[in-house]
Amino acid sequence: MPTQTDSFEPLVKKSRKRASVRTMGCRLNQSEGVALEGKLREAGYDLVPFGDPADLGVINTCTVTNEADAKSRNTIRRFTRKNPKATTVVVGCYSQISANEVAMVDGVDYVIGNHDKLNFLDYLSEEKPDSPVVVRERIDREDFSIGLVGEAKFEQRANLKIQDGCDFMCSFCIIPFARGRARSREWTDLLADARQMINKGVRELVLTGVNLGTYQSGGRDFLAMIDGLSELEGLDRLRISSIEPTTIPEELFPRMADSKHPLMPYLHVPMQAGCDRTLKRMKRRYDLEEMDAFFKRATANIPNLCIGTDLMVGFPGETEEDFAKTCETFVDGPFSYSHVFTYSEREGTPAAKSSDQVPMEQRRRRSAHLRRLSSSKRMDFHTGHEGREMRVLLENPKDGSYFAYTDNYLKVRVPVSPQGLENRIAQVRIGQAFPEYCLAELFDWESS
C-alpha cells in the first residue's frame, strides 16, 4: 500500500542521467510541463523523447474527465513497461484527486499532487522506494511564485502561467478540487519570467491559468497586468488563452482593436451550454441574453475578432430540446469554432449525484452532431479570409512549410521560400481554405 510521508532525503544529482516528461491535458498543464523539463535540465538530466529508454519518467496528468484518468493510467503503464528499472513519478491533477488510485498502478514510485508538482525533485531519494510515496499537501490560497524558467526551452510562442485555481464551483467541475481556490502569480515573478522568455526569443506570450480574469496581485488586476506586460520591449504579441465570460473587462476592446497593440483580437470564451435551463443547472454565472449583448459589443468594437468557445454535451437533465437550443445558439452566434466535450461524471461534484444522467449513447450522438456543426463553422471562418492580406508569426518549418497564426488565430500554411524566416513577423495573402488551415502566400517580412 502507498505510504504517506513528509520527510525525504534530497536527490543526489548524478550527471547525464536521462529523463522523460509526458504532459497531458490543458494549456496550463503544458506550461507547467515546460517548467518541469527546465528543472530536470538544471538538475543535470538529459531530456529524451517519451518512449525512449530513460532513468526517470515524469508523467504530468489530467483528471478533467474519466477518459483523461484512463489516458493517464495508460501513459504510466506505457512508460513503466518500457523502463521497468526507471524511477516513475506521477504528478498533476490525477495525482491530486486520486492519489491512492495512481499509487496502485504497477511501477509507480512517487505520486505528487499539484502543491508540490514543480518541486518534485526535492522528494526523490537516491534509491527507488519499496512502495509508492504519496505527497499530497493542501493547496495554499496565497499568491504564488514559480521562479525563472531557467533552462526551459521555448519556440516562437510560449505559455505564461499567471493564475491557478477557481472559486466559481460550477456543478460539473472537478478543477477547484484538483487545483485549489483562485490565486494569482506574484506580479514581480510573472514579469521576470516574461522578460526571460522574451530574451530567449519568444515573440508571443499566451496567458494561461484556470480562471484568468480573476487575476489580482500586488494591486494589479487583470487589465493592469495586461497593460504591464504590453509595455515589455521585444514582445510582439500577447494572447489570452481562455477566459470566463463574466470576468472579461470591456476595457480590453480598444486594445484588441488597435493593430499596433500587442494584445491579439482573439477571445476563447467557455460558454459550456447554449441553453438557459442547462446554464442554470451548471451554476454558470450568466444567461443567453447577457452573453448575446456582450458578444454584440465585442464584435462591434473589435475588427477581425475571432471568438471560440467550449460546449459540454449530455449534462444531467439535458433534453433533446435543450440540446437543440445549444446547437441553435452556437450556429447563430459569432463563434468561429467550438471545443466539444462529452459530459463525464466526476465524483464529488454536485452534477455527478444527479439522478437525471443522460445515457452515454445519447451523449456521444449529440457530441458527434455538435462537432460536425463546429467543423462547418470553422470552415466558414477559414473561407471568409480567402484573398485577404494578414500578419502572421512564422513558426519552425515542417514538411516544407511554415505554419503560422494570424493575429486573430487563423492557422495558415506557407511554403518555405525563402528559408530561414522562422520567428519573424510576415505579411501573407490568404489562399485556399481547408478544414484545418488555409494556404497562404508570403509577400513581405521583417528583416533579421
Residue ranges and their predicted role:
Residues 1-208, 213-214, 267, 288-296, ...:
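Proteins enriched for Cys/Gly/acidic motifs involved in redox and nucleic-acid/cofactor modification
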Residues 6-7, 20, 353-448:
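Terminal RNA-binding accessory module
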Residues 234, 252, 334-335, 350-354, ...:
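Conserved N-terminal phosphate-binding loop of PLP-dependent enzymes in the Aspartate aminotransferase
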Residues 107, 257-264, 332-336:
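Glycine-enriched alpha-helix->loop->beta-strand junction motifs that scaffold or abut catalytic
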Residues 68-70, 181-186, 216-220, 280-284, ...:
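Short, solvent-exposed loop/turn segments at secondary-structure boundaries
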Residues 170, 190, 207, 240, ...:
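Conserved, mostly hydrophobic/aromatic
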